[in-house]
Structures are given as C-alpha cells and as structure tokens.
Amino acid sequence: MIEVKNLVKRYGDHYAVNHLSFTVEDGQIFGFLGPNGAGKSTTMNIMTGYLAATEGQVLVEGHDILEEPEAARACIGYLPEIPPLYPDMTVEEYLRFCAELKKIPKEQRTDQLTKVLALTHLEDMSARLIRNLSKGYRQRVGLAQAILGFPKIIILDEPTVGLDPKQVVEIRDLIRHLARTTP
C-alpha cells in the first residue's frame, strides 16, 4: 500500500504538486491523468524517493520514503519516463546488473530473469545490445527492470511510450496480470 499525505512540491512560487493526498491499496491499478506540467512525473519521483517533497509524507508499505528509504524502495519497482539503460550491455547483462543492485539472491537471479524476459516478450532479445534495440524494445527492457524481483508496488511513468498499438495492449494486459498475481 502507498499512502500520500498532503504532498507539496514547490519551485520558488510555483507549485508543481499542491497538497495531494491519496491511498493506493494492494492489487489496485492507479493512474495519473493531466496535461504536461501537471505534476504527474514529479509526484512519482517523490513517491519513489528520487525527489524530495517540500512538504508532506509518502508511506510505502508503512515505511516513510524519507526516514526509511531502503526499506521503502525495496518494495517498489520503478520505470521512469526515460528508462536508465546502458546501451553497451546486452539485455541479459543489464537485467543481471539490476538484479544485483536490487539484492536479489544470486541463486534466484536466473529464474527471475527467465520469468521477466518471458513476461515482457524479450526472450529472443536477451543477447542483443540495448543500443541495437528499437525504442519499443528498450521500453520493454525498462519495464523488465521494474518488475524484476516482483516488487509489491510497481510505479510506471508512461510505460507505453514508443510502443506500437499491439504492444500497448500487451503492456496494459501485463500490468493487469501483475496486479492480480504479484504477491
């Protein structure tokens, strides 16, 4: 569960986020809609601990994102608007690197990678350099990184950007599947 309480992000006199409060329950799919500059990405960056709020509180599974950042982040898989990919790595190398960063036990990594590659339809791309992938496939690699370890909470910032209409449907179906099946 995520609880956002009176969240404020101010840049000088401009409010990017102005006293926003909401709760997202386990298994719930929750989205932000709004025009460019409405504070959607800013809110997600605060929720994941990548940006500090001016005021307010974010609790992730009961952990305050500022007071217990490691415990809170361990519950979150995050796909930012622009996935932080390493173009000189293969898909598999990158995901193994991410598994190590996420402290997934070594003996579980191969199984985790196999599952994530299958869910994101990247099995045939695992040996390819990320630099040689289309934008749609790079987006899938970012999504695979976010769901690696099957975190309780997955935060996706524009997960279907760069995907063709068929891939958009597949990713939305995957998100619904994860909401139903992720422990």
Task: Describe the residue ranges of each PLM region.
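Helical segment within the ABC ATPase nucleotide-binding domain
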Residues: 169-181
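Conserved ABC ATPase "signature" region
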Residues: 96, 100, 107-125, 176
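A short, proline-enriched helix->beta-strand linker immediately N-terminal to the Walker B motif
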Residues: 148-152
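Conserved ABC transporter NBD signature motif
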Residues: 56-67, 71-72, 76
